[in-house]
Every structure is written in structure tokens, then in C-alpha cells.
């Protein structure tokens, strides 16, 4: 094949140009994201039961739904939480590869079976089923620069005008409103109700009867008799729109004809539906809409669509109201992609310089450089067919591929140059002879490197998604690289290279002359060194065994993790106030946190948004959240200016805040996989020990974790039990007084909860009508005595006649995991420890907890456990596949063994470099390790291919063949290894977005290449000689027999 294109160079150019054009066209159409869909698909079921406690919601809603969630395809696990505000959320997580749309449909079908068993009030509220991601990908908000609108006004504006169009955008999965829409609020006075002998149920019934939309039909509607001349729509009663209309609702007509209307029983106002959450942006009242990405959504495209929609809506906002973006993850994505693009450009330049240093000819250097755009662009034409998008993982793979793909071209060019210099051949003749010598080696290298990565593409879970991005991209690049080296590069060599004049290679002056003389001297020393090693094989085999054993030991010392930490320019701070603390107290702490961040860290922090009434541990007046966005990475280059350092200083300062627990934390590397980096686990009550026992086990766990040096910031992702006032109804007394239990329940729901009645129309939108007691009637336990229920005789009976109350302790938030009562705990490894170390410590702590308390990991931690279990299989399978490919290629068992023996030498350097930089054995390290395995094997193949040729075909004695092959291939091995190492070096020294993952990949690769090159060139001849002697002792070829006689 190579000869065909050597004789037809224009044909080769045409193919290269077509490949580049196809890639450029594909590049403009490929989606761009920071990561592929690494997070497992999940579906969320959301329900509200107004006025219900967390326990009530768990018993009457959560468990009913859980019992129906069986038989779902690809089901992995489910987690549920219920809160004291009546809200409930069940998150069902599926295996990677499950279609999120089908998963959502299946969950909805199962939910239909559970719906008839749910409380009527829950059914009336409706159930939401949405595709779900854990973290917000952005928060959009509104502020009023005039100061006229409160956060509740702004919340209504978002709910009325922005929420629907934004939530319909493709890619938006779920949302959380930091604010609330308006509702028609009817505040009932219990004294007035009692004086008119009415109950909240009477008011609700009157509203339902009079606030209705009546479908009245038509005049002259068909069928009718002939001669009818009129057809008109009959308009009946419509829903009310203003507080004044609701005030006039007739509740009761007395015997004397006097009327009791709603306005006689309390106040009617247009007010917020929910007062629990309020927000501030840079100290101003604001409201926000937190958006979660839909499973499978494209983050950049979704952010672009959201901002475009908001630009359209700006024209319809009141004067002075501005759109803000207090939290946006898209700059992280863009910065990560830009960083890798710069890395690729740096890699190309460095590779070019290394090649020029060795080839010392601009013509010879340009040839392998031209291979880079051809292969990379052609790869983009093929990637979409494998479901691969443009993301940081494919770009990292491209960086690795640059060093790999120029290797093949360098091997061709260097061998052609050698033949021209050593044998005086013309470029055309040298190219033809060269391709006859090295075509097998090129195919072998391509097969080996492909074999290294192919097994990675078939692993499951989130790690499998990461492996696949690298595997597919590198295998495509390697395959194209081999084709370019067999088609395009020979054509360029035959037409671009010039024959040397008077052995010019050895007569160069200046720097290149010095370099060549130095390299030749060192080559001679190297040749003598290889000869010495082959004379003392036993000694050096022992050294190799020690290196291998040391590598195994050092490997066990690397801390384990799933993904490295990243500076994404984002930080969150949770505020947890004491039990039963008011929203006013929480606001004071939120302001203190905000002031510290904007004043003490003002040079690094761009802006903050505070949210009162909500954090990831739950909702409530004692909860708060601060969203922090740091300045651009270019403005934070100095030591101590990264987000982890900012969070560390912030936590040291927040520890001094009295009467509050304030914790700053950083999002995980993959934002869709959690809210905070570290570990995420559930303690489960496997034996049904009860809530008190579970909480006691949780507290014991937290105490033991606080004493463990490898753990820090271990905290419950929930709420402690708090004082609750329990009302006990004496059914016997109630029946004796002829009071209906249903009337009692209705009165309690309306008085202290918030009873949803029906809907009204506000500015053309449907909103809700609620009745509730005035604030003075629901402040203290004594206020229960203010409420009355009407019995069957029409008499008003006070609550105190049939009800008593007492203070108890109960949880404002209950959790379940896998259908079992559980508590969620988050934490981080202490400085100097990894998440793998933390998990070992957790396992030790679990042994001290009571029997019946189980442990399950969630989110990123679940993936880390799963990845750790897969890693040994990945290593073993990779080595096995490489061995089998080489055996098939060379029709020999000895050659593959010689190649495989070199692998520990590369791993040795990778492990040393990773330990030296204090990095962890994460998924990226494993990718780097597999790359090192392939490159180590490649160097071995280059030597063994020549030694095999000399020994088996030319009859050169075995030892001489090994020494000669090592001498001949030393220069290309050093050149290709340096080219690859310098190509990866920009990743090893990267800063800014995505630097953690780049360091993790490149550090191991650079360290592995150094040892794989420095040690392998000495040990590969030894391995080849020893293996041939062992495997072919009985064959006794002529050269081997001659050598033994000598």
C-alpha cells in the first residue's frame, strides 16, 4: 500500500485534504460540553402535602409510592426525604445507559398505581415527575434597582413571567424558586368565626361554590329546529380575580336575613404563596430560579437558550428590574475547553521543537507536523458516529494523541533519513526500503496502543463513560495515525526530503554539530552498557525484580479517589442555626457571612447571593445558603487564591460565629454528581430499630468521625430532632360532644397549616387560594383554645374540650434510602488524605456502631467504590489483550513476553511521579497508566522488531542482534519519547479550570515515559535475549547455535 502512494503523492494529498474537510465540517456541528453525561440518569418525584409533618408525609406518601417502584428497568437505587413543610422528594437513580425519557415514563406509570392510595389533599396538589440532576447548573434572578419591589414581589414576577418559558427549554430538568408566586390569602380570625358559629371548613366550602368557572353552553347550538337565526356563546360565572371579590363571598345568611361574608371573618390579601424562602443579591432584595440540568442535557446549549429567552423577556419587565446570574457554571465549561485548546497548541509547538532538535531539518520536521492536523481533524469526522461530543475528556485524549500520532510519522521520517545517510540512497529509494522495514512495526504499535485502550470502552458506570471518551478518541487517532504513516507520510518523504550531500549529518556545525557529537558519544556508551548488561543477565534480572516489587508496594501507597478536586470558581456556604431559630436570626448570620466574603475576600470574590430558608440539608427558618462566585482564574494566579484555599480560610473564620454552624464547601469536579466534593453516605436502619436508635447511631458516628484524623467536616445532610407540639385528639370525648373528626382535621389544617381551596386568575395566570389563621392565632400552644369546631347540634365546641397538647421531639426532615429509614451524612477527607482513605476510616467506624445499622454510599462515592472494584480487572485485561495482539501479530509467544516485561518499568515512573506530586489514584490516573503501558510497549516493539529481523532473517547472533537493534533504534526512541513527553508537559503544569484532571493524567504519563525510556532501552535487549533463550532453547537456530559455540 505504501509503495502505491509513494508513486502517487498527489493522491495521498487529496485523501488528506478530504479527511480534513470532513473533520472541519463535523467540528462545527458537534455539541460542546464540559463532560459527557457522566452522572447516572435519575428521575425525581415531588409532592406537597400542606400542613403535614415529616412523619405524616413519610407514612402516608413516601412509603406508599416506594412500594410501587418495583420492576423498573435499569434501577440502581432510590433516596427519599420528607420535610415538616409537607414537601417530599423521591430520587430514583438508574444505571448508566438507561434512556432517561423511558425511565421517566416508567416511573410515571408506577406512580399511577400509587396515586389512588395517597391523601386527597396530595392528589389535589398534583405530583411532579421530572428528570433530575443533583446540582444547579445556573441560578437566574431578578433585582429591583429602584428598591420598590420586595423579594416576594420579585418572586411572583419570576413565577408569573419567567418560570414557565424557562422550564420549557430543552435541557432544563427541574427548578427551585427562591421566592414564591402570589396567592389569594384569606386570614381567618378564630374569634369572629366563633361569634358567627362558623368554621374554616364553612369558609372553604363557600369559596369552592362561588369561585368557580361555569361552562354554560350556547344559544342556538346544534341540534336545533329549522329557522333558528341566532347562535351565541352563553358566558356563566367566572373565577374571581381580586381581593375585593373574595371579600364579598357569602358564607352564611342568618335567620333575620343578615349576611356573613368573608370580609366579616378576616382579611383577604394578595400575598406570597410561601413565605419560607427569601433571597438577597449583593445586599439587595432579590428572587432567583435555581435550574437543574435534565439527564442527557447539553449544558452550554441549555445556558445559551436560557439567556436568549431572558433577553426576550427583559422587554416585558417593570422599569428598574434587572436580570442577574448569581450562579452560572457555563464559564467553567468554556474556560476548561479554552484551557485544553491552549494546551493542544502548546503541545504541537513543543513537539515540533523536539523533532527539529533531532531531525535537524525543517523539511524533515514539517512532515510529521503535517500529520497532526490531518489526524485530529479526521478524528472529528468519526467521533460523532461513536456518540462522542466535544468535551474536556476528548480534548485531553487529543493531547495524548498528538504525542502518539507524531511517533508513527517520526519513525518513518527518521528511518528514511538514516537510510539516506548510511546507504546513500535517494529519498524515493530510501522511502521504499524504509517502509519495507518498518511497516510491520507501525502496524504492531498501532495494534498494541489500540489494544491498551479498547478494553476501557466496555466498562460500566460513570468511570466507564470517562474511559470510553479516552478509549474511542485515542483508538480513532491511533488508527488514523497508522494510515497516515503508511499513506501520507511516505508520499511526503519521497517528495519533500532531500538527499544529504557529503554525509552532511555528521558535518553539521554549531549547536546541532555539538548535539550530534554528544549524542553519538552517548550512543557508544549506551551500546557498551547494553553489552555489559547482557553479560550479567542474572544481576540485572534481579534488579528488574526489585523494581517490579517496589512498584507494587508504591502502588498500594497512592491514595485512592474517583475524581480529583477542581477549582471551578464556585463555592457554596451552608448556614445551620440552632433548633427553632427564626428567619430573622438566620438573616443576621447570612449578612455576617456575606460581609466577610465581600470585604475580607473581596479581591477574589466577584459576587454572592444569600438565600434564607433553604439549604441542601433542608428547608426551614433556621436554614440558609450562600452562593459564591469567584473572579476569573486569570485574576487568581497566586498561591492561596484558589477556591479550596478560600473555602479553608472561610471555614476558619466561620468557626468563630456563635450560635450557628456555617460550612463553606466546593462543588465536585463533575457538577451534575453532587453538591459538595468529598464523600456522601447513608446510615440505614436495616433491622427497624426505630428513629431514636438511628439518630443515636448517627450521633455516635459523628463523634467517632470527629476524632478520626483522616476525616473532617463530617456533618449530617439533614436536620436534628427539634421540639414539636403534638396535639392529641380524644376520639371518645369528640364523639360524645358530637364533633366530627373530619371537621376537627379540617379546622387544624386551615388554622395552623395552609389549606389550599381552589384557584383564581391573576393577570391572566391561574394561581392558588389559601385559607389560614391570622398570625396572632397560631403563635403559642395557648392559641389552640381560640379555635372552635361546630358539632352536630350546631354548637361551637372549643378544642380544649376534646384535645390536649404536649411538647415532644421530632425530626423536621426524614430520609430513606433503598426503601429503608436512613440518615444522610456528608464529609471530606482531611488534608493529606484521599476519599479512599476516608472510606477506610468509615469502614472502621461502622464496626463500632450497633448491629443493624448499615452503610450505603451515594452519588460520587458510589461511583468511586464501583470504580475501585473495576480497576484490577481493567489492568489485567489490558495486559492480556496487548499480549494476545502481539502474539497474533508476530506469530510468536516469545516476542509478546519480551514486550510485556517492560510494562513495570513504565508503571514505576508513573507511580513515583504521582506520589511525588501528592496526587491520587483516580480515574484520570488510570487513563494515564494505561497510556504508559502502551508507550512502554511501543518502545520495546521498536527494538524487538529490529532484533527479530536481524536474528531470524539475517542470521546475526542473538546478543549482537539485540545490541545492534538497541543502537539503531535509540535515536528514534529518544526522539519520540521526548516528543510525547513534551507534548503532555503543558497538561502537567496547567492552571485554572480543569487543572486537577490535567495534572492527574499528565503527571503519571510524564513520569512513566521517563522511566520507560531511560530504563527500557537497557532492559528490552535483556528481556529479548532471555525470553528467546527460554522459549527457543529446543529450536537451536543457526545464529543461536553459533553464539553458544562461541
From Swiss-Prot:
It is found in: Cell inner membrane. Gene3D superfamilies: Multidrug efflux transporter AcrB pore domain, Multidrug efflux transporter AcrB pore domain like, Multidrug efflux transporter AcrB TolC docking domain, DN and DC subdomains, Multidrug efflux transporter AcrB transmembrane domain. Disulfide bonds: none annotated. GO terms for molecular function: efflux transmembrane transporter activity; xenobiotic transmembrane transporter activity. The chain crosses the membrane at residues 10-30, 339-359, 370-390, 392-412, 440-460, 470-490, 542-562, 871-891, 895-915, 927-947, 973-993, 1008-1028. GO terms for cellular component: plasma membrane. Induction: The ttgDEF operon is induced in the presence of toluene and styrene, but not m-xylene. The keyword Hydrolase does not apply. It is a multi-pass membrane protein. It comes from the Bacteria. The keyword Transmembrane helix applies. Keywords: Cell inner membrane, Cell membrane, Membrane, Transmembrane, Transmembrane helix, Transport. The inner membrane transporter component of an inducible organic solvent efflux pump. Involved in export of toluene and styrene but not of m-xylene, propylbenzene or ethylbenzene. Is not involved in antibiotic or AMP efflux. NCBIfam families: 2A0602, RND_permease_1. Belongs to the resistance-nodulation-cell division (RND) (TC 2.A.6) family. This is Toluene efflux pump membrane transporter TtgE. It comes from Pseudomonas putida (strain DOT-T1E). The lineage of its organism: Bacteria, Pseudomonadati, Pseudomonadota, Gammaproteobacteria, Pseudomonadales. The gene is ttgE.
Amino acid at each position: 500500500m505504501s509503495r502505491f502512494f509513494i508513486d502517487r503523492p498527489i493522491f495521498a494529498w487529496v485523501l488528506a485534504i478530504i479527511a480534513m474537510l470532513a473533520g472541519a465540517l463535523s467540528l462545527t456541528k458537534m455539541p460542546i460540553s464540559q463532560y459527557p453525561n457522566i452522572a447516572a440518569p435519575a428521575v425525581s418525584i415531588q409532592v406537597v402535602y400542606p400542613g403535614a409533618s415529616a412523619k405524616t408525609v413519610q407514612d402516608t406518601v413516601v412509603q406508599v409510592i416506594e412500594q410501587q417502584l418495583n420492576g423498573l428497568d435499569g434501577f440502581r437505587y432510590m433516596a427519599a426525604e420528607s420535610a415538616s413543610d409537607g414537601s417530599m422528594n423521591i430520587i430514583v437513580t438508574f444505571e448508566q445507559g438507561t434512556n432517561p425519557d423511558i425511565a421517566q415514563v416508567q416511573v410515571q406509570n408506577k406512580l399511577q398505581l400509587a396515586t389512588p392510595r395517597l391523601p386527597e389533599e396530595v392528589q389535589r396538589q398534583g405530583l411532579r415527575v421530572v428528570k433530575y440532576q443533583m446540582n444547579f447548573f445556573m441560578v437566574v434572578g431578578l433585582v429591583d434597582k429602584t428598591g420598590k419591589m420586595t423579594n416576594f414581589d420579585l418572586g411572583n414576577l419570576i413565577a408569573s413571567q419567567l418560570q414557565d418559558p424557562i422550564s420549557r427549554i430543552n435541557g432544563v430538568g427541574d427548578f427551585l424558586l427562591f421566592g414564591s408566586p402570589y396567592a389569594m390569602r384569606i386570614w381567618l380570625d378564630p374569634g369572629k368565626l366563633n361569634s358567627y358559629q362558623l368554621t374554616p371548613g364553612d369558609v372553604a366550602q363557600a369559596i369552592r361554590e362561588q369561585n368557580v368557572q361555569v361552562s354554560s353552553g350556547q344559544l342556538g347550538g346544534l341540534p336545533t329546529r329549522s329557522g333558528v337565526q341566532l347562535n351565541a356563546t352563553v358566558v356563566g360565572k367566572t373565577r374571581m380575580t381580586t381581593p375585593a371579590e373574595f371579600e364579598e363571598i357569602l358564607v352564611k345568611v342568618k335567620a333575620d336575613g343578615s349576611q356573613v361574608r368573608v370580609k366579616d371573618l378576616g382579611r383577604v390579601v394578595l400575598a406570597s404563596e410561601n413565605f419560607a424562602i427569601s433571597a438577597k443579591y449583593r445586599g439587595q432584595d432579590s428572587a432567583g430560579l435555581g435550574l437543574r440540568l435534565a439527564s442527557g442535557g447539553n449544558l452550554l446549549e441549555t445556558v445559551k437558550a436560557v439567556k436568549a429567552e431572558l433577553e426576550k423577556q427583559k422587554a416585558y419587565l417593570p422599569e428598574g428590574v434587572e436580570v442577574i446570574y448569581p450562579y452560572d457554571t457555563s464559564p467553567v465549561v468554556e474556560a476548561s475547553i479554552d484551557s485544553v485548546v491552549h494546551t493542544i497548541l502548546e503541545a504541537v509547538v513543543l513537539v515540533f521543537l523536539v523533532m527539529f532538535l533531532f531531525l535537524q531539518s525543517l523539511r524533515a520536521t514539517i512532515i510529521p507536523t503535517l500529520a497532526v492536523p490531518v489526524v485530529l481533524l479526521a478524528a472529528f469526522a468519526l467521533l460523532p458516529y461513536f456518540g462522542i461530543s466535544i468535551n474536556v475528556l476528548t480534548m485531553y485524549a487529543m493531547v495524548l494523541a498528538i504525542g502518539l500520532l507524531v511517533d508513527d510519522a517520526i519513525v518513518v521520517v527518521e528511518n528514511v533519513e538514516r537510510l539516506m545517510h548510511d546507504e546513500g540512497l535517494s529519498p524515493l529509494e530510501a522511502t521504499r526500503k524504509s517502509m519495507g522495514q518498518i511497516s510491520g512495526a507501525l502496524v504492531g504499535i498501532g495494534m498494541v496502543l489500540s489494544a491498551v485502550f479498547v478494553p476501557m470502552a466496555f466498562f460500566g458506570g460513570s468511570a466507564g463513560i470517562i474511559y470510553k471518551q479516552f478509549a474511542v478518541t485515542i483508538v480513532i487517532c491511533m488508527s488514523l495515525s497508522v494510515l497516515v504513516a503508511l499513506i501520507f507520510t511516505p508520499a511526503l518523504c519521497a517528495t519533500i526530503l532531500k538527499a544529504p550531500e557529503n554525509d552532511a549529518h555528521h558535518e553539521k556545525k554549531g549547536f546541532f554539530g555539538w548535539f550530534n557529537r554528544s549524542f553519538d558519544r552517548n550512543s557508544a556508551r549506551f551500546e557498551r552498557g547494553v553489552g555489559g548488561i547482557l553479560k550479567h543477565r542474572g544481576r540485572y534480572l534481579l534488579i528488574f525484580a526489585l523494581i517490579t516489587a517496589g512498584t507494587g508496594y508504591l502502588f498500594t501507597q497512592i491514595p485512592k479517589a474517583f475524581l480529583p478536586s477542581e477549582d471551578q470558581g464556585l463555592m457554596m456556604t451552608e448556614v445551620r442555626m440552632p433548633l427553632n431559630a427564626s428567619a430573622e436570626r438566620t438573616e443576621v448570620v447570612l449578612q455576617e457571612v456575606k460581609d466577610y466574603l465581600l470585604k475580607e475576600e473581596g479581591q477574589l470574590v466577584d459576587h454572592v447571593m444569600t438565600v434564607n430558608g433553604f439549604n441542601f440539608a433542608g428547608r426551614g427558618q433556621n436554614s440558609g445558603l450562600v452562593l459564591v462566585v469567584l473572579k476569573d482564574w486569570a485574576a487568581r494566579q497566586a498561591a492561596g487564591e484558589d477556591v479550596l484555599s478560600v473555602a479553608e480560610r472561610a471555614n476558619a473564620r466561620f468557626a468563630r460565629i456563635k450560635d450557628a454552624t456555617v460550612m463553606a464547601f466546593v462543588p465536585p469536579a463533575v457538577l451534575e454528581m453532587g453538591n459538595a466534593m468529598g464523600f456522601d453516605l447513608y446510615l440505614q436502619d436495616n433491622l427497624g430499630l426505630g428513629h431514636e436508635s438511628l439518630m443515636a447511631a448517627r450521633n455516635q458516628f459523628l463523634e467517632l468521625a470527629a476524632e478520626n484524623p483522616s476525616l473532617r467536616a463530617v456533618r449530617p445532610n439533614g436536620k436534628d430532632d427539634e421540639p414539636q407540639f403534638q396535639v392529641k385528639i380524644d376520639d371518645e370525648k369528640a364523639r360524645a360532644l358530637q364533633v366530627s373528626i373530619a371537621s376537627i382535621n379540617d379546622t387544624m389544617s386551615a388554622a395552623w397549616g395552609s389549606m389550599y381551596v381552589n384557584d383564581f386568575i391573576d393577570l391572566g395566570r391561574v394561581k392558588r387560594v389559601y385559607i389560614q389563621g391570622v398570625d396572632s392565632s397560631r403563635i403559642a400552644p395557648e392559641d389552640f383554645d381560640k379555635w372552635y369546631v361546630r358539632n352536630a347540634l350546631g354548637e361551637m365546641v372549643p378544642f380544649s374540650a376534646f384535645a390536649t397538647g404536649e411538647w415532644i421531639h421530632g425530626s423536621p426532615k426524614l430520609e430513606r434510602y433503598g426503601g429503608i429509614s436512613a440518615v444522610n451524612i456528608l464529609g471530606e477527607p482531611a488534608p493529606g488524605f484521599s476519599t479512599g482513605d476516608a472510606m477506610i476510616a468509615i469502614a472502621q467506624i461502622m464496626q463500632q456502631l450497633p448491629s443493624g445499622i448499615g452503610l450505603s454510599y451515594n452519588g460520587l462515592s458510589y461511583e468511586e467504590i464501583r470504580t475501585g472494584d473495576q480497576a484490577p480487572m481493567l489492568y489485567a485485561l489490558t495486559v492480556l489483550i496487548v499480549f494476545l495482539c502481539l502474539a497474533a501479530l508476530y506469530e510468536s509467544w516469545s516476542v509478546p513476553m519480551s514486550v510485556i516485561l517492560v510494562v513495570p518499568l513504565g508503571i514505576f515512573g508513573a507511580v513515583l511521579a504521582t506520589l511525588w506530586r501528592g496526587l491520587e489514584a483516580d480515574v484520570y490516573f488510570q487513563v494515564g497508566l494505561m497510556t504508559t503501558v502502551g508507550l512502554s510497549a511501543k518502545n520495546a516493539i521498536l527494538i524487538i522488531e529490529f532484533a527479530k529481523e536481524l536474528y531470524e532473517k539475517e542470521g546475526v547472533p542473538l546478543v549482537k542482534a539485540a545490541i545492534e537493534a538497541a543502537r539503531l533504534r535509540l535515536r528514534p526512541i529518544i526522539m519520540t519519547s521526548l516528543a510525547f513527553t513534551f507534548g503532555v508537559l503543558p497538561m502537567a503544569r496547567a492552571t485554572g479550570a480543569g487543572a486537577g484532571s490535567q495534572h492527574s493524567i499528565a503527571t503519571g504519563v510524564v513520569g512513566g515515559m521517563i522511566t520507560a525510556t531511560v530504563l527500557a532501552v537497557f532492559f528490552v535487549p535483556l528481556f529479548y535475549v532471555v525470553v528467546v533463550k527460554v522459549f527457543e532453547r529446543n529450536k537451536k537456530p543457526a545464529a543461536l547455535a553459533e553464539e553458544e559455540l562461541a
